[in-house]
Each structure stands twice: as C-alpha cells, then as structure tokens.
C-alpha cells in the first residue's frame, strides 16, 4: 500500500475514533440524565400532582413569571388535594395542620433557593431572608417589641396622623357630587397612606406622599420594580447570580444608585445612620426599639429597610380587598354602615368630624372585626410559597388522617389563598365574601374611618382593579372609585 495513502488515512481514522467516542459520551450523559430524572421522579411518586411536575419545574417557573402562582396553586390543589407536587423537588400543601407541623418542628429549614432570592442587599440577610433558624429566631425576638407596638407607644398616634392626612386629601381633592364625578384610584391613595404610615412608625417621620398626593420620591415605583425584577430572577433561576462575590454587586441595588430601589435604600440608610450617630435621641419609634434591643450598625440598616419595604407593600392587598368587597356588596356595606352609625350614636365611637376612632374602640365593633377577618382571608397580605426543606432522613406528616412520607431535602411550601378557601374548613360558600362566618375581634380601623365619613362607588365594577403577585406579595393598582360626602 502506498505510504502516502496511509498518511492521509491516519487523521481520518483518528477523527472516526473521536466521533465514536463523542457519540458514546453523549449517549452516556443522556443516560445519566434520564436515570437522574427517574430517580427524582420516584422519590415523590406517592404524592399526587400533574405528571409533568415530576420531571420539570418550567410550568412552576411560568406561573411565577405570569404573576399568577396563587391561582395556579389553587387549580392544582382542587384537582390533586391538600398535598400536591408542583415541581420535581417541591410539594405544596393547603393543610393548616401540615403547615403548622412544617414550620414548628425542629429540623426544617427555610429553603435557600427561595429566601436568598428575596434579599434586598448584596449578600446580606435580614429577618425575612435569614435561613439559619437560630439567627432568625434571635433576630425576631429583638425586633418584636418595635413591630408589635409594645416598644413603640406612639405607633397608633403616628398612624392616626397619616389617616387624617388621607381623609383630608380625599375631602379636598376627590369629593364627587351631583354636579361632578371625580374618579380616584383608591389603591394608590392607600399606598401613599401605607408608605407614610410605615415611615412614621419606623423612622419617626412621614415621607409626605399624602401631602404631595404622589409618589414624591419614586419610592413606590422603585419598590414595585424591585419586586418584579426579583420575581423574574427567581422564576428564571438566576437569582443566585446576584449573590456572587464582586460580580453580584453589579446586579443588585445599591444606596449609591441615583434612581430605582437604590435611592430608597439611601434615604432609609441615611435616617438610620443619623439615629445611630445620636445615641441620646429620645424618639419613640420602631427604629429606636430595634436599637435598644441590640440591633445596630449594618443590621439596623437592613432591618429598617425590610420593615419599610414590606410594611409599605404587604397590607395593600388586604386593605384594598376589604374595601373592594364592602363597596361592591350592598348588604355588607349597609350592615357595616349601620354598626358604625350606631356606635357613634351611642358614644362608643366618635361621630364624623369629632376625631378618629381608637384601636380599642374599633375592637368593640364585631361586624367591623368580622369584615376585616374576612378580607384578610380573601386577600391575605403575603401569599408566597415560603418553602421549608425537609430534614435529612425525611419526615412523616398526616394529610387528612393519612400518613405521608417526605424524603429529606424535599421542599414543602404552602398556598395561603387555597388554604383559606377550603370548603371543608370555611363552608361551601368559601369563595364568597361573608363576614358573618367570623364574628371574632381583631385589630383594624381604616375601613371604619373611611366608611364613617364617605360613600363609595366603583367606577368600573366589571374590572375594579389590577393585581399581580410578585415574590408572594400582591401589587394592587387602578382601583378607581367615586367618593361622596355622607349627609
């Protein structure tokens, strides 16, 4: 054979061998992938759920991207029961007993993939994102007095001042009459009220959103944009990149930013730094309580920031939901109005123009309290999955009287909306807004203040508002109403 021919054939033979090995490698990797998928599927095959949930988490990611997780969870729960698989390694429950077991039994840890994605700062945790159980519980004890009000005696007064600003804003700019109908976005006004209230409660001074009748510093928009970006990062699975040393700083907000959430951070941090630099400051607010209980330095900055962020957003869905269902339900509206009028008539609450009802007085109005509870059931402020990781070795939970084994490492989350609308717990009319199911006292007075002074009517009953779910928090907007003075 010609030697030249052998020299020419050698590279070709080498390429053939390389191609065959590459093909074997591809087949091997594909086989390992299939085996791994089958193993993951088999771990939770005893738990009902959509077939695809055992192999892919993309439907779950899609629901997060569409800000529609709660409706998606509810649909799965309706079909597969109170314990259902929603992703290869994630199960969702609507059982209060199972969720109480998961959150109270030692060994369960908050899932890093979810809670770390909710960090506001680069590689820094707060009480909301801390997954170390001991650190989380310790920080909660430090913050509790300032959050509950026991360490912040001026909390009610601070909220009342903002409530008076809200009433003044409505009366001075948005009062409709027979001659003119003036639409008002109630959800946005409530947002201004919340932002001013939480800043007054936390930092001792309202930000002035109600006085300016606007998002004067862009804080609301920047917070909402941050929540949307966080949801997108979590859904697409790249939120971990925000926590990478050095590089992650480029992807997260910073107090050095001139716009967006970083601007909100800078304002909050400046207030905290000013307080820390003046230890003799005798103001009584949540931040002062935090500092008195040992939360200082960067920790004080982080906790004040999350307290401001969550406090300005979380209650909005419940408050808007309560008012929406009262305004759109003539029977509930009339009963609540009658109770409030009777209380004012008998001296159990101040009459219109004679000041604000106190928290203690509001707790003595049973139908008001039932309405608030029903609103919280219908529109829970926080609806995220908030998963816990099953401890090593696994655990057994009881679902509707039957034991169900959960392998170690599996994530267990909850669907609050579906849980609060279970017909076996709340009755066959669980999807209806009916305060009579409660009649138990609870805190709250904003609905009382608004309903005692004004009459409301929805501008568009067919589409009364817009909502979207971001990181388990409902963002509510475009709740247009007409407000008239009560005669």
Residue positions per predicted region:
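N-terminal membrane-proximal hinge/A-helix region immediately C-terminal to the signal-anchor transmembrane segment
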Residues: 2-138, 160-165, 193, 259-266, ...
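Cytochrome P450
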Residues: 2-30, 88-90, 150-161, 173-200, ...
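Cytochrome P450 C-terminal beta-domain/meander region
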Residues: 78, 84, 292-298, 355-374, ...
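Cytochrome P450 I-helix active-site segment
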Residues: 160, 180, 218-221, 225, ...
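Central I-helix of cytochrome P450 enzymes
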Residues: 194, 203, 264-268, 288-339, ...
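Cytochrome P450 catalytic core segment centered on helix I
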Residues: 219-293
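Cytochrome P450 heme-binding "Cys pocket" and the immediately downstream C-terminal segment
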Residues: 330-334, 443-473
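Conserved cytochrome P450 K-helix/beta-meander segment immediately N-terminal to the heme-binding cysteine loop
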Residues: 414-446
């Amino acid at each position: 054979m010609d030697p030249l021919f052998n020299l020419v054939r050698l590279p070709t033979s080498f390429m053939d061998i390389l191609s065959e090995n590459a093909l074997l490698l591809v087949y091997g990797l594909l086989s390992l992938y299939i085996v791994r998928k089958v193993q993951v599927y088999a771990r939770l095959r005893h738990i009902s759920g959509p077939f695809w949930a055992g192999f892919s988490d993309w439907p779950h990611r899609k629901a997060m991207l569409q800000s529609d997780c709660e409706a998606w969870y509810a649909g799965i729960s309706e079909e597969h029961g109170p314990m259902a698989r929603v992703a290869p390694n994630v199960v969702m429950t609507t059982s209060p007993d199972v969720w109480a077991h998961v959150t109270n039994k030692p060994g369960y840890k908050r899932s890093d993939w979810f809670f770390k994605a909710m960090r506001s700062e680069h590689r820094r945790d707060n009480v909301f994102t801390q997954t170390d159980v001991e650190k989380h519980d310790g920080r909660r004890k430090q913050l509790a007095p300032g959050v509950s009000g026991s360490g912040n005696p001026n909390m009610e007064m601070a909220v009342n001042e903002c409530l008076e600003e809200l009433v003044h804003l409505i009366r001075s700019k948005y009062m409709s009459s027979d001659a003119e109908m003036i639409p008002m976005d109630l959800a946005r006004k409530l947002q201004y009220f919340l932002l001013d209230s939480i800043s007054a409660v936390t930092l001792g001074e309202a930000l002035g959103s109600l006085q300016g009748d606007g998002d004067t510093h862009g804080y609301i928009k920047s917070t909402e944009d941050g929540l949307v970006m966080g949801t997108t990062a979590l859904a697409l699975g790249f939120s971990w990149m925000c926590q990478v040393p050095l590089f992650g700083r480029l992807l997260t907000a910073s107090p050095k930013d001139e716009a967006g959430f970083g601007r909100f951070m800078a304002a909050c941090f400046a207030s905290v730094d000013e307080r820390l630099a003046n230890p003799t400051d005798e103001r009584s607010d949540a931040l002062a309580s935090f500092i008195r209980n040992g939360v200082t330095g960067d920790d004080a900055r982080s906790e004040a920031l999350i307290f401001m962020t969550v406090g300005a957003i979380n209650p909005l869905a419940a408050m808007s939901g309560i008012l929406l269902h009262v305004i759109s339900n003539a029977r509930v509206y009339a009963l609540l109005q009658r109770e409030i009028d009777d209380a004012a008539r008998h001296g159990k609450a101040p009459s219109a123009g004679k000041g604000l009802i106190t928290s203690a007085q509001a707790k003595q109005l049973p139908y008001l309290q039932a309405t608030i509870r029903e609103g919280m059931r219908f529109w829970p402020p926080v609806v995220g999955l908030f998963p816990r990781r099953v401890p090593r070795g696994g655990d057994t939970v009881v679902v509707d009287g039957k034991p169900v084994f959960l392998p170690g490492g599996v994530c267990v989350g909850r669907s609050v909306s579906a849980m609060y609308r279970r017909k076996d717990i709340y009755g066959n009319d669980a999807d209806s807004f009916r305060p009579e199911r409660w009649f138990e006292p609870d805190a709250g007075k904003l609905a009382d203040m608004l309903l005692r002074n004004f009459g409301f009517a929805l501008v568009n009953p067919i589409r009364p508002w817009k909502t979207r779910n971001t990181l388990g928090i409902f963002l509510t907007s475009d709740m247009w109403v007409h407000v008239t003075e009560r005669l």
